[in-house]
Structures are given as C-alpha cells and as structure tokens.
Amino acid sequence: MNQTKLNQRLKQQQLFDIYGELLTKRQACYFNEYINLDLSMQEIADKYQVKKSSIHQHIKTCNLIFNRFEAKLQLFKKQQLRLKLYEKITDPQLREQLIKLR
C-alpha cells in the first residue's frame, strides 16, 4: 500500500472514530469491518449475504457523511491542529496536563 492510500485509510479511521456514531448500525458495521478489520468488500458481502455493490454503496455513503460533517464541524482538522500544538510544547509536565484534557 503506498503512502497516499495509507494516509487516506488512516484519515477514514479517524473520521469514523469522530463521526461514526452518526451512522446507522448497518453502515457502522460494514465500515468498521472494511476500514478497521481490513476485510474486502466481497468478504463483507459474503459474511452478510448481500451484494458487493451494496457494501460499496454503504462505504461510499459513509465517506460522504463524514466529509459533509467534517466540512461543517471541522473536528478532524481541529484535532490535527491541537496535536501539532502539543508537539511544540517543550515542558513535559504542561504537555502531560494538556494531553489529559483531550
């Protein structure tokens, strides 16, 4: 897997962590198995006895949902900015206290 795809997958995992509760149970289940358990769409389709195209549509819909919410709320972007700021803090005690507040 090249670096771009790896970064994209990592972002999808993080968006799922942030916005996953907004999905239906079925969407969350399929997306979790696809992204976090690294199952192929065909494996998920076989497991739940549905068409691969159905899984593809659910995954696509999840990504659209995440992108819409991120465009409005920018929780992922703000999280990334906070992490960059934490890295710049040199005082170990202050850094620990701020990390606990996350």
Curated annotation (Swiss-Prot):
| Span of the signal peptide | none
What Pfam families does the annotation carry?
UPF0122
The record's listing under InterPro entries reads:
RNA_pol_sigma_r3/r4-like (IPR013324), UPF0122 (IPR007394), UPF0122_fam_protein (IPR054831), WH-like_DNA-bd_sf (IPR036388)
Q: Give the top-rank taxon of the lineage listed in the UniProt record for this protein.
A: Bacteria
| HAMAP family registered for this protein in UniProt | UPF0122 (MF_00245)
What family does the database annotate?
Belongs to the UPF0122 family.
Per the entry, what this protein does is: Might take part in the signal recognition particle (SRP) pathway. This is inferred from the conservation of its genetic proximity to ftsY/ffh. May be a regulatory protein.
Specify the protein name: UPF0122 protein MPN_424
Origin species, per record, is: Mycoplasma pneumoniae (strain ATCC 29342 / M129 / Subtype 1)
